[in-house]
Amino acid sequence: MKVGWVGDCVYVIGDYGGFNITTKTSVENQTAKGWYDECFVTYCDPAGGERIQEVPGGVKANNSVDAGIDYIIALIERGKFFVCKDCTGVLGEIWDYSRDENNQIVKVNDHYMDAMRYAIFSAVTSGVVMA
């Protein structure tokens, strides 16, 4: 997920994903696309363990699900959140993000949503994990 800020607006400008591919293959594909730049931190799924070390600039993301979702919803409500039309992974999942009858996040078809939340919320909290 590539995310950028202009002022207080957040722009999702690129997404990349694949199923059942290794971290090495993912990194190679993203490197070929020019995604790794020394000036960017790469926030990774904290459950990734040692695989995070395989990602250039990889650090554990803030995985505070509810706080991260609430932050992104607030951006959307204020008109401060934009997604590039080429981000088909994000656009394909964003409307599926939902809660069940107990107000718990439904964990299905959400890989891009998790990546987006990691990128946006980890950056604004400087990687601080909120409990």
Name each model feature, range by range.
Residues 1-5:
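Gly/Thr-rich phosphate-binding beta-strand-loop-beta motif of the actin/hexokinase/Hsp70
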Residues 109-131:
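Charge-patterned, long linear interaction tracts outside catalytic cores
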